[in-house]
Amino acid sequence: MKTFSAKAHEVKRDWFVVDATDLVLGRLASEIAHRLRGKHKTIYTPHVDTGDYIVVINADKIKVTGNKALDKKYHRHSGYPGGISTTTFGKMQERFPGRALEKAVKGMLPKGPLGYAMFRKLKVYAGDKHDHVAQQPQPLVIQSQA
């Protein structure tokens, strides 16, 4: 018996749509990262992108537990001296709905070209409309545990 290794051109990728209304940020991001990597498939191979496409709608309605809406901080730096900028989860959700989910998922994927290719299969939309009706995405139910 030989160990199976998936080939990139043989992988069948499905499209799924996730409604993020009232789901917890970290738990949702973890499940999405798991599916983007393809770890839910029997043909999973670490060095091949075997994951599916995920479309997230209602990303503006994602929740965080506890007081993290005010306490959770996101930092970035412009590259100039004194150019550090900090924002909270609540402010980021108001200004850029869905960016917190993108950052959470991106942090859970591998770093490097393979991880970047996996991240490109994630499509996040703030409202309940998306541009991927032609791909006929199947609804994916993720259980809320909060």
Curated annotation (Swiss-Prot):
Give one Pfam hit by family name.
Ribosomal_L13
Its BP terms in the Gene Ontology are: negative regulation of translation; translation
GO-annotated molecular function? mRNA binding; structural constituent of ribosome
Cellular-component GO terms for this entry: cytosolic large ribosomal subunit
Indicate yes or no for the key word Membrane: no
Q: Does the keyword Ribonucleoprotein apply?
A: yes
Provide this UniProt record's keywords sorted from A to Z.
Ribonucleoprotein, Ribosomal protein
Bilayer-crossing residues are none
HAMAP family reported in the protein's UniProt record: Ribosomal_uL13
Q: Fill in the subunit field for this protein.
A: Part of the 50S ribosomal subunit.
Write down the PANTHER family for this protein, in alphabetical order: LARGE RIBOSOMAL SUBUNIT PROTEIN UL13M, RIBOSOMAL PROTEIN L13
Q: What protein family is recorded?
A: Belongs to the universal ribosomal protein uL13 family.
* Reported function: This protein is one of the early assembly proteins of the 50S ribosomal subunit, although it is not seen to bind rRNA by itself. It is important during the early stages of 50S assembly.
Please identify the protein, giving its name as recorded.
Large ribosomal subunit protein uL13
Instruction: Tell me the organism.
Output: Methylobacillus flagellatus (strain ATCC 51484 / DSM 6875 / VKM B-1610 / KT)
Question: Which taxonomic lineage is given here?
Answer: Bacteria, Pseudomonadati, Pseudomonadota, Betaproteobacteria, Nitrosomonadales
